[in-house]
Amino acid sequence: MINLIKIPSLIIVWATALTACGGGGNDSVAPSTSFAQASKTPLVPGTTPVTTPDATLGTAPGTNPGTTPGTSPGAAPLAAGSEPVAGNAMGNFFIPAAAQAVNTRTPARTIGTGTPESCTSAAVVIAVAQGGVITFNCGTNSVNIKMTSTAKVFNDKPDVTLDGGGLVTLDGGGTTRILYQNTCDSAQVFTSNRCDLQASPKLTVQNLTFRHGNSVGQTEEGGGGGAIFVRGGQFKIVSSRFFNNHCDAVGPDVGGGAVRVLGVPTVFPVYVVSSTFGGAAGLGNECSNGSALSSIGVSYSVINSLFTHNEAIGTGANPAQAGKPGGGSGGAIYNDGNFFSLQLGGSIFRDNNANEGGGAVFYVSNDRSGTLAIDTSTFARNLSRGFETVGFPGFFIIAAPGQPSSTSSTFSLG
């Protein structure tokens, strides 16, 4: 039985299924993380926020969580200016070795020769196509690189690490998807007859800002991924920011205004570490579903990150209906499929909205085998205009029995 709150009438509904649930992929690899059962407390406006024991979030102001081994991404701080910095500075959730920043001290190639003018879209496209560790030398100040074409990873080249040093913005100009990896795209070279199950290439983006990426009208693999689209291999985001990225406004499964991931085996979770999606009014990402992160059958570990002002703007949920083309679920995150996991640690989700279900997070494991773990995280003012799970405002959850697990986290509507 699924315990739901129906918005805006706030009528509690009991159901065994919901039309918001879409079909999804499945991988046969078991997850390496086990999750404990958590209690659920109904919450309606005016009641006390749900708080699991010892609710805290990170270190005290003025301290540096990066000095503790295992908690620092090892990345350069971003030049913030008047914009939000990368990540939740108060988050101190443990960062495993696989999730930490790649060492870029000896790059395979460097974009730029020391001036902003030398850092061009063409230079980024060429460097990514060649692969390897890539850094930038665009001068000592922040630089905005207008991407006039998409940088694409070639599957037969070395793993790509793209490190902006905290100074580089890749800007899609509202017309261009910025970065693309697809192990099942013959144009990027097939390296396996099981392209969805291969472990390479590995794509890492760190110390970068992705702005105004746009995949509207991109129909391959179902679309989505305004800033970054990934199918297959492995993928990691460290100390990066995503502002004003967009994908299609309608569609039952299209998603990822910022990031769309498909076909990554669940044994290789997508790591999102110390990164910001939106972060302030006017900077949020937007798509039919999952405006920050969207995937089908892919596991995630989201650590010490910030998600605000992202909005799922589709209508009609899933499947599409007459007069309602579908979508509108998962203001920040949309995870659909069968067997996969989602871990949220040391992160803040605030002021995200969904026209249908899950103002912050839409998590649906159609065969009820998936797991959702929430640790030392805060969820506030995430509006679900259609439906959500009782006791977890801003969430819609269908998962394995006893899920989600929640430790030292807070959930509130105000």
Where are these regions (language model features)?
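Bacterial Sec-dependent N-terminal signal peptides
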Residues: 17-44
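Right-handed parallel beta-helix
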Residues: 164-167, 200-214, 234-248, 266-284, ...
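N-terminal pre-domain segments of enzymes
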Residues: 70-108
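Extracellular beta-strand-rich solenoid/capping regions of secreted or surface-exposed proteins
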Residues: 125, 129-130, 146-163, 169-206, ...
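Acidic Gly/Asp/Thr-rich repetitive segments characteristic of extracellular carbohydrate-active
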Residues: 111-135
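The right-handed parallel beta-helix/beta-solenoid scaffold, focusing on the short coil/turn
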Residues: 132, 143, 150, 158-160, ...
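Acidic/polar low-complexity surface segments
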Residues: 179-185, 213-222, 244-255, 261-262, ...
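Sec-dependent bacterial lipoprotein signal peptides
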Residues: 1-19
